[in-house]
Amino acid sequence: MSVSLSSCSSPSVKNPLLLCADSLMETYPDSALSILESITYPQKMPRADRALYALLLTQARHKNYIALEDDSLIKTAVDYYGDKKKSLRAAKAHYYWGATYSEMGYTSFAVEEYLTAIRLMPVRDEFLAMIYDNLAECYERDELFDIAIGAYRQAYQILRGGSQQIYPLRGIARMCLLQNKKDSALVYYQQALDCALVEQDSSLIGALYHDLAMAYSEKKDYIQADKYVSKAIMIQGQDAVNVCLSKAQIMLNLNKLDSASYFYSKNVDQLDIYGKAVYYDGMYQIAKKRGEWKTATENIDAYKILYDSIQFITDNEELNRLMDKHQLEEHKRLLSEHTKMLIS
């Protein structure tokens, strides 16, 4: 999804480097970033130029997958463009403020800024759809699946009929699956797959085959699940860690123990703590079915250790979520004080 700022470039911005970076942003974000980073003493620019510089630099970093570690830069753009009058730049400023908060783990504040960005959008286009998509991800993160699916549907209504509709369709399908609406999930995943096949997007095709395998597994239709996970492996290869774990679990459910053992062990050195927990639990199930009690005990003991670690991580994440609102209010207060100091 791509929207250029150049279509609404302010006549007050004359800096040729800013205008050049703006024109390159969607097609060559790495070049845009290089240009922006070459600008010396941006603080000496006129206020309009500083605001555009802050917006473009945040955008370029985000597009180049550079972490947005604080909001001091984008706040310059937010303060300049405001939140009263509809404009693409104002919407973009609040969107990237939301993206910054999202990366910092402040989901509640990210939602607030995404909603502001939606309100400020002057047109219904791909950028608005992207805001809805990111808003949906925040709701999904907080397990507000009913609200998340509404945001995904808004994105889909904008993108319907185009190649980008794959993303909200996949989001809708995932929300249906999380709400135990398995048949609806299958319908939306199939729609997304049909679109990906038309576009011949191999990475999305492989991902959607995997999605369908998981949906059929939830329905306990392991024959269909195996059909789709095998297709995913054909596209993504046996180095695809999560796909191989899914294949192993499906093989276990089909009681094909040798195949299950092979796929559980395929990429064991690459597994994170969650993957290793799945691995040890699966190997325990296999050993138990074979009557190999010593091996079963070793695997279940390893699984329990990992489970305790995962539970500790989960408890901390829940604590962070409970603290989130308090932290954000404090952060907002400090920002307000900082702004007052700059004005006075």
Question: Language-model segments: which ranges?
Answer:
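Structural signature of alpha-solenoid helical repeat junctions
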Residues: 12, 47-52, 69, 89, ...
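Hydrophobic positions within repeat-based interaction scaffolds
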Residues: 13-26, 30-33, 41, 68-71, ...
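N-terminal leader/linker segments that initiate helical-solenoid repeat arrays
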Residues: 8-71, 75, 88
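Amphipathic alpha-helical segments of tetratricopeptide repeats
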Residues: 37-42, 75-82, 115-120, 153-157, ...
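"A position-specific structural signal for the A-helix of alpha-solenoid helical repeats
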Residues: 19, 56, 89, 96, ...
